[in-house]
């Protein structure tokens, strides 16, 4: 079972912006209830999309620079990056189907 990649301010560029595959980034925090609600979904997606897309998690408390750079104001926020740019976003504890629809769309474009 594949684990989401833990992102930091230091590895964000290499793991996300330079990635050849689309990347789903979950901006979250340990104290955030809705973030804990979608954590199992993000975990599942990491395995389901292995080899097709990267799935990562960024703790906004420990990677404040990156969170600020992307204007993260509400968490959880899920950003989908393609070719180093934000291709789509979801804000809040959204259903898995909504995430997979957006992720699948990024794979087909």
Feature map (PLM): residue ranges:
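Conserved Rossmann-like nucleotide-binding pocket used by diverse enzymes
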Residues: 3, 8, 28, 54-56
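A short beta-strand-turn-helix
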Residues: 4-23, 64
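Short pre-active-site segment immediately N-terminal to redox-active cysteine/selenocysteine motifs
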Residues: 20-21, 27-31, 74
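Conserved helix-turn-beta segment immediately C-terminal to the redox Cys motif
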Residues: 21-22, 39-58
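Conserved redox-active cysteine motifs that mediate thiol-disulfide chemistry
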Residues: 27-41
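Structural microenvironment flanking redox-active thiols in thiol-disulfide oxidoreductases
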Residues: 60-67
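Non-catalytic, surface beta->alpha helical segment in thiol-disulfide oxidoreductase systems
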Residues: 82-109
């Amino acid at each position: 079972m594949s684990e989401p990649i833990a992102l930091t301010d230091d590895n964000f560029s290499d793991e996300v912006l330079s990635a050849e595959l689309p990347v789903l980034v979950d901006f979250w925090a340990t104290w955030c209830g809705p973030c804990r609600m979608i954590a199992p979904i993000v975990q599942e997606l990491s395995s389901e999309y292995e080899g097709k897309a990267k799935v990562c998690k960024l703790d906004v408390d420990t990677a404040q620079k990156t969170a600020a750079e992307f204007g993260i104001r509400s968490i959880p926020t899920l950003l989908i990056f393609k070719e180093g740019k934000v291709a789509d976003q979801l804000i809040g504890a959204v259903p898995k189907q909504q995430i997979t629809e957006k992720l699948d769309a990024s794979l087909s474009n």
